[in-house]
């Protein structure tokens, strides 16, 4: 990506290793980026609670294996480039927010990711995913990918439609952005202050982690 979040190469993908701890995932990441040349910085968007370059939780990978792992430092050493580690929803938010008022970014994928911004500044470490929403289920369990496969798209979309006014009441956002791989499944009418965003924003936002201007600049927080 360039500094404006524009793709300079095709998007590369690999399957998540069967063993989802760092011993398998880190080598897979290093192998993935081998074809890429001429980059200056590395940005990692991680699905969990991260701080100061370390992983603290990884509910959809394996917190047991990831807790306390210094992912930013390890990748920086292996690739030889300055590396920053942030929550994946936070990184996606950097690409889509307008920088005005209270903006909430939610990602619908394997789990439920959230990022919160005030006038363009990130309010980090917010994990709405683990708040109970229905009986004993949290947001992850209520509208995550495993549940979507279990109950089907029709019932899953009804659940997503149900939580939007709940989020509006609890967070009082000025604007809500819905992204992640499953957001493209939504086909019902959304409120005027709710916008569907491309899943590519998760990568586009990585450029703004290193962007030199404005409140969007983000280090390891």
Kindly give the residue locations of the regions a language model identified.
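Short glycine-rich, Thr/Ser-proximal phosphate-binding strand/loop in the N-terminal lobe
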Residues: 1-24, 121-150
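Short beta-strand scaffold segments in enzyme catalytic cores
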Residues: 1-2, 48, 94, 112-117
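A short, acidic, amphipathic alpha-helical segment used as a generic capping/interface helix at domain edges
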Residues: 156-169
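Glycine-rich phosphate-binding loop and adjoining helix at the ATP-binding site
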Residues: 10-43, 49-102, 141-142, 191-212
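Short secondary-structure boundary segments
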Residues: 46, 108-110, 180-181
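A polyampholytic, Gly/Pro-enriched intrinsically disordered region
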Residues: 103-107, 147-151, 213-221
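Glycine-rich phosphate-binding loops at beta-strand->alpha-helix junctions
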Residues: 167-199
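Anionic-ligand binding region
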Residues: 101-104, 108-133
């Amino acid at each position: 990506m360039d500094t404006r979040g524009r793709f300079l190469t095709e998007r590369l993908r690999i399957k998540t290793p069967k063993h989802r701890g760092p011993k398998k995932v880190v080598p897979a990441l290093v192998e993935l980026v081998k074809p890429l040349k001429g980059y200056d910085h590395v940005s990692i968007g991680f699905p969990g609670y991260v701080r100061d370059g370390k992983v603290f939780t990884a509910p959809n990978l394996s917190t047991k294996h990831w807790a306390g792992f210094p992912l930013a430092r390890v990748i920086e050493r292996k690739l030889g480039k300055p590396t920053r580690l942030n929550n994946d929803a936070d990184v996606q938010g950097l690409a889509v927010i307008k920088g005005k008022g209270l903006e909430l970014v939610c990602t619908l994928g394997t789990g439920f990711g959230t990022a919160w911004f005030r006038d363009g500044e990130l309010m980090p470490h917010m994990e709405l995913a683990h708040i109970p929403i229905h009986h004993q289920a949290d947001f992850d369990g209520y509208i995550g990918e495993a549940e979507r496969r279990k109950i089907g798209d029709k019932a899953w979309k009804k659940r997503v439609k149900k939580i939007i006014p709940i989020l509006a009441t609890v967070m009082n956002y000025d604007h809500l952005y819905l992204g992640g791989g499953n957001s493209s499944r939504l086909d019902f009418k959304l409120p005027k202050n709710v916008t569907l965003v491309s899943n590519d924003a998760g990568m586009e936002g990585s450029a703004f982690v290193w962007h030199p201007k404005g409140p969007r600049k983000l280090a390891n927080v």
